[in-house]
Regions:
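Hydrophobic helix-and-loop "lid/oligomerization" segment in the mid-to-C-terminal part
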Residues: 1-41, 45, 59-61, 78, ...
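Active-site cavity-forming subdomains of large catalytic enzyme subunits
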Residues: 31-99, 104-121
């Protein structure tokens, strides 16, 4: 979301209610997005085997890009693209990435392709510095309990440095509420910050965590973080 904001593109976020809709994409969820006239749907941490929902989007002329890391099967949905290091035909050797890591690598590739066609200069937009997102990527990496090897280790090492700068308003507010006064660590991500962000989904406020991480208003951040801290 923050990336699209930097590109001056409009976007919608949709977090399924896990009690009513389950964890993955659903036809009902996609219908809500399509009714809002979206042109493309990204699924994150899900979608590799969501045949029905993706077929529904295709029938409505909306492309779907899947950013996932869950195990796949030989047959895959008719999506525009399925970016998943655990596809049976994948040769990246990045099977250990979580969905946040997969999404980050997608943005790295997207940035590179946009740079090649001079998209940033043509649209008078500064190229996003993706390092600034590594606090969020490291949060996802730690909370998904994936091995801290290879690229994951590098992501978390750099991400903790970015987290220390408190550039993300939502994370900054959570750190203040958690009274994290030392240099942030893996423990802080996994046991203090992460559980609070996930808490919204367990109490019927499934969008609170995402809204907090996308929010740039201090007062709104404090309200959301306080509710997640209860």
């Amino acid at each position: 979301g923050n990336y699209f904001s930097e590109l001056n593109l409009e976007y919608e976020t949709y977090i399924p209610d896990r009690k009513k809709e389950g964890y993955g994409p659903s036809i009902d969820g996609f219908k809500k997005l399509i009714d809002k006239k979206v042109k493309i749907i990204f699924t994150v941490d899900c979608g590799t085997l969501s045949f029905d929902a993706i077929n529904y989007a295709k029938e409505n002329k909306v492309d779907v890009i899947v950013l996932d890391h869950h195990q796949s099967e030989i047959k895959l949905p008719n999506a525009f693209s399925i970016v998943n290091p655990n596809r049976l035909d994948d040769k990246s050797n990045l099977q250990y990435l979580c969905a946040a890591g997969v999404s980050f690598m997608f943005l790295v590739s997207l940035n590179r392709e946009l740079r090649k066609i001079n998209w940033f200069s043509k649209n008078n937009i500064n190229e996003p510095n993706l390092i600034n997102y590594l606090d969020l990527v490291s949060l996802g990496t730690i909370c998904d309990v994936v091995p801290l090897i290879g690229l994951n280790r590098a992501i978390v090492k750099q991400g903790l440095k970015v987290l220390k700068l408190k550039k993300n308003m939502g994370l900054k507010t959570l750190m203040d509420i958690c009274k994290i006064e030392t240099n942030p660590s893996i423990y802080h991500l996994g046991f203090l910050i992460g559980p609070r962000i996930n808490a919204g989904g367990r109490v019927g406020k499934c969008s609170h965590g995402a809204n907090l991480l996308l929010n740039k208003d201090p007062k709104n951040s404090f309200r959301l973080a306080s509710e997640l801290d209860q």
